[in-house]
Amino acid sequence: MDRAGADMWASTFTLAMAERKPQDVWVLLPEHSLVPGCLDGGGVQYLLVGLSRLQCGHCPGTWDSAHVHVLFHLWWDRASHRGLVKMRIWGQRCRLCPAPGDCQVRPPGEQPFLSRLVLHILQDCYGDGPGPARHPREAYEGCCEACELGVCFLQKAPDPAWSANATKGNFPATAWGGTGTVSRGKPLSTPGDDLGKGGVVIAIPFSLVGTSNDQVPIAEGPAPPAGASLPVTGSCEALVIGQGSIFLSGDSVAMPGGKGFPVAIGDPLFHGPGLLGSSIQTFELKGFLFKGRGSLCSPVGVAQGWGPISLNNGLVPVGKHTPTVFYCVGLSASGEGSLTFPSSLTSIFTNTLSEPTDGPVATKEASITFPFIFTDVKDAVAEVAEGNGKEGGGQGLVPVGHDALPETNAGGLPSQVKGSLALPFPADVQGKDAFTDITEGKEKEGGLVTAGHDAPLEANAEGPITVSEGCITIPFAVFDVIKRKGGGHVAYGPQGNGCFSQGYYQKRQLRSRFHKARCGCRREEDERPGRACRRPHAEPYEDFWIWVSMTVCVFWLMCMCRLNPGIYPQQV
């Protein structure tokens, strides 16, 4: 920002505050080196993201941007009636200039930002009037300077330096003219952000062994929130392709001490891009861990936000850190659930296992454990809680209460726990490994016991067990099935069986254009009779336009012959 632009912002702000609080003196100082989170003397940090018109400092080019960041640091001395505001603007580079050039807000683009700032000061410093409404804005990519510096308020979780604010120690959430705050260390990203950015999404259905038949129903959609029912299942059923285990715990920092309950793993389902971005409100945790059968090893890695992790059977080299990924685990009151993750996770596992390791890689015996925490039980099924939960003889997960857990656990994970679940044990899974609470010396009345002890199912039948987190372990063979199906087998709409590839639809379109749809369909039916019944017919609109084109051509020829009757005899 040049000198003229700085004077314009300062004078406009000073006049606005003088009109409302003439007895006080407020000064605005633009500062190019202002750093988020570094406040001294009880200052308050305030962020605005909005639409403005930018002007290049080297050329006369101007453009509109909805991704303009303005950071304010405020200090208010009530005794001396003096206030100080420091500000910094993050704009965008000019696309017309060959060299990156500074930009500034073109007048009168500063008016909306300063008006919001004045309203914020009047509310927080003087207690006058309501605060501005909050309207979160969508993150924009491109030439954003804040994104390149790693300080973008919208796209990434805040750096620890951004966690400072006022006297409360909270970070201002991204707001359009607002000051909503989130807890220290809590990421700004919402659940399922990475699942809705495009690409294929894979869902692995599972069910508790003993709560259903030997087959696992196919869930035709994303994983639902805790306590809610799974999406409508299809009429057909998928055979079990493997067996894993699920562990639930009532402690926010507990790690599994046993196998937990066995679960039957169903055939993976492929979904198109964007199916989960707007509907996922389930359980999520950054990070994952590899785990194999055999004796436990000393911890050689740390899963982000979870604490020490044991990596077994040499699946991951010592000192190698696993990347951060997003996934969701959905559970229902019937004991069924699904593990949902982007298809890129498959390549991450494959690349990790393909690298040379110090020990043998036994992929057939290997398993992968996904830890998770319950984050949303507000939409729980009340009748299930009243029925099965009180009697203790029903099956499945029953939501109870809304006891908040600590905001961060041992590994520094920003816990987003809003509630907990209660699990009355199924009657026909007796004799299996029980859930354990590995917090030493801690005992709960719900039936959870200390580390290393199996909880007797008879004692648990008296009441539901409150759980707040857990982990699910699936065999690595599931990813072999995913690789065989391929990333191109994406199901859209009601045909959610993962049998159709994108290339298949392109071939169908070409066959329809050259009037070979029927012949091609017969050849495919002979090769793969099991899938022929599920394949759609050629697009009707293509055939329609073909017939329209032919009709127009015939009509044109008839008109030409009628208008020029001598053409035909001459040709003969």
Curated annotation (Swiss-Prot):
InterPro entries: R-trans_p, ZAR1/RTP1-5-like_Znf-3CxxC. The keyword Zinc applies. This is Receptor-transporting protein 5. It is a single-pass membrane protein. Pfam families: Zn_ribbon_3CxxC (PF13695). The gene is RTP5. It comes from the Eukaryota. GO terms for molecular function: olfactory receptor binding; zinc ion binding. One of its GO terms (biological process) is protein insertion into membrane.
